[in-house]
Design a protein with these regions (language model features):
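Conserved structural scaffold segments of CAZyme catalytic domains across common CAZy folds
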Residues: 1-108
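Aromatic- and carboxylate-enriched substrate-binding clefts and catalytic-loop regions
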Residues: 68-186
């Protein structure tokens, strides 16, 4: 598809072309998809998570997000995104985060919880973490440091997003993902 215009602004006026070249939404029940504002929790502690939930309620935010470090050092192949194992560089208190307690607290206050997971863990554990995160009450996953642009990685990304949709988990892509219109379908 080639888009042409007399003025650059006219391209933006017709930026729905790529979106509309994709099939319509294939998700039968989209009620779980709730766009909103999210704020990152940086202390990786139960207290910090609850405090951020309270902040989110007061500021009309819809989600909190636990970033890198909640399942270990994200660049270590041994890090396991099925466990809450804090990266000691981020928080030396190994048992400082009771994620299930924070998720329950957030749910009581109408706030969703999202988790950061980098591509290394996503590639190795995606099929394992999706049902687990669903059972934990997680609202979505922030894909981190994913490869973007090539056909191979775009296909991988689309398949991963489809799998997340099967479990009712929203996806936030951390990196410079190039829109392909796939968001119309999933």
């Amino acid at each position: 598809v080639i888009m042409c215009a007399d003025k650059p602004g006219e391209i933006l006026e017709h930026n729905d072309i790529l979106l509309n070249l994709n099939p319509p939404c294939r998700i039968k029940d989209t009620s779980w998809i709730k766009p909103g504002k999210v704020m990152r929790e940086v202390t990786l502690t139960t207290e910090g998570g609850k405090a951020l939930v309270d902040f989110a309620v007061k500021r009309n935010l819809q989600y909190i997000h636990f970033d890198a470090g909640w399942y270990g050092f994200e660049y270590d192949k041994a890090s396991d995104a099925t466990t809450v194992t804090l990266d000691p560089r981020r928080n030396p208190k190994i048992d400082a985060l009771n994620l299930k307690e924070v998720v329950a607290y957030a749910k009581q206050h109408g706030i969703g919880v999202m988790l950061y997971v980098n591509q290394r863990a996503l590639q190795q554990q995606l099929d394992e973490i999706l049902p687990l995160y669903k059972s934990w009450g997680i609202s979505g996953i922030k894909f981190g440091f994913v490869q973007v642009g090539s056909q191979v990685w775009t296909k991988w990304m689309h398949e991963a997003v489809k799998k997340c949709a099967d479990y009712g988990l929203m996806v936030d892509i951390h990196d410079e993902y190039r829109p392909t219109g796939f968001s119309r379908t999933y």
